[in-house]
């Protein structure tokens, strides 16, 4: 957004408003991400591009999303715009990469709607492969812009190792990974002794990543479906099918 002096700012919305509270540094965020966002702000001014204004629906850049692979160091930058038209696109991306050579992929996400949702449904890859990878519990995971992935991988590894300990898989179990996202915990279970793993996720892009992750890790005893996990499990129960272990991360209301 713009402050009262018409300077470009970035931060978070004040509660129940569209007023942006400037944030230049976040103690729990990766420092490289903070620096990239500062650079994007400067480039907007250099290229005479305006930030999006939620009240008027005008302006170019709505959000900046930065994702970083904890173990790989790969960095994704997603520029969320209100229009598919990106003036001086190649020069803008080139200037960003010159300042931050650690960036491995840049995407433009197009979100033209008057909505509080951050990401739209259309994406263009401007640089790199369009995704990053990270390693967790001995598996490599592909992460796209819209795919869920735990933001604290150190604690995630502790959580998943504990879940595997509780599951005590012996090689005979059918495991359901409900709301599976990119298939992280399900694929770890598949590698750690499950007979078969079934992952269910409503986000189509996340399911694509889960399937790619199974291939990437040469895991053949896992399959993934794009569906509402709650409805899918009700249908499974109605058909008389059973699972030995159900994994939900995070746990959902009604699961007890």
List the predicted regions and their residue ranges.
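Rossmann-like S-adenosyl-L-methionine
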Residues: 88-256
């Amino acid at each position: 957004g713009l402050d009262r002096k018409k300077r470009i700012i970035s931060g978070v919305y004040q509660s129940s408003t569209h007023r942006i509270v400037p944030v230049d540094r976040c103690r729990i965020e990766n420092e490289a991400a903070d620096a990239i966002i500062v650079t994007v702000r400067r480039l907007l001014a250099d290229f005479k591009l305006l930030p999006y204004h939620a009240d008027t629906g005008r302006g170019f850049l709505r959000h900046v999303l930065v994702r970083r692979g904890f173990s790989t160091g790969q960095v994704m930058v997603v520029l969320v715009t209100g229009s598919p038209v990106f003036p001086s696109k190649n020069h803008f991306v080139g200037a960003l990469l010159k300042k931050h050579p650690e960036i491995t992929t840049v995407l433009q996400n197009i979100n033209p709607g008057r909505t509080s949702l951050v990401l739209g449904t259309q994406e263009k890859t401007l640089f790199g492969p369009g995704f990053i990878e990270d390693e967790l519990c001995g598996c490599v995971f592909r992460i796209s812009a819209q795919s869920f992935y735990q933001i604290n991988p150190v604690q995630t590894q502790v959580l998943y190792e504990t879940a595997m300990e509780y599951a005590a898989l012996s090689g005979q179990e059918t495991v359901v990974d409900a709301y599976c996202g990119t298939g992280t915990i399900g694929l770890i279970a598949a590698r750690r002794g499950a007979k078969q793993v079934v992952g269910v996720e409503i986000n189509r892009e996340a399911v694509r990543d889960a399937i790619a992750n199974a291939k990437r890790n040469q895991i053949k005893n896992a399959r993934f479906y794009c569906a509402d996990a709650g409805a899918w499990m009700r249908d499974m129960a109605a058909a008389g099918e059973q699972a030995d272990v159900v994994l939900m991360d995070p746990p959902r209301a009604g699961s007890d």
